[in-house]
Swiss-Prot record:
It is found in: Cytoplasm, Nucleoid. The keyword DNA-binding applies. Pfam families: YbaB_DNA_bd (PF02575). The keyword Translocase does not apply. The lineage of its organism: Bacteria, Bacillati, Bacillota, Bacilli, Lactobacillales. GO terms for cellular component: bacterial nucleoid; cytosol. GO terms for molecular function: DNA binding. This is Nucleoid-associated protein SpyM50270. Disulfide bonds: none annotated. It comes from Streptococcus pyogenes serotype M5 (strain Manfredo).
Length: 99
């Protein structure tokens, strides 16, 4: 059986690895897209919006609702990508905890 000191060392090592993975993830960028890529939204891995792009074809003053829907679609797509990457990157640590 592992003694308490070894468990603490292992937990600290895992914490440092996890912090590094979180920093790596935060530095990444994720771009979500709407249908036909008419709207794109780019976020950092820590969910900060860094850019949004509208293709000319979607900008219609008579149809603002479509632009709103596509913007929502692009944002949700990017956030889903971030959640999946976070789960994949940090989920591995759950099984490594020494307790």
């Amino acid at each position: 059986m592992m003694n308490m000191q070894n468990m603490m060392r292992q937990a600290q090592k895992l914490q440092k690895q996890m912090e590094q993975k979180q920093a790596d993830l935060a530095a990444m960028q994720f771009t979500g897209k709407s249908a036909q890529d008419l709207v794109t939204a780019t976020f950092t891995g820590d969910k900060k919006l860094v850019g949004i792009d509208f293709k000319e074809a979607v900008v219609d003053p008579e149809d603002v609702e479509t632009l709103q829907d596509m913007t929502t679609q692009a944002i949700n797509d990017a956030l889903t990508q971030i959640d999946e990457a976070t789960k994949k990157t940090l989920g591995a640590f759950a099984g490594k905890l020494p307790f």
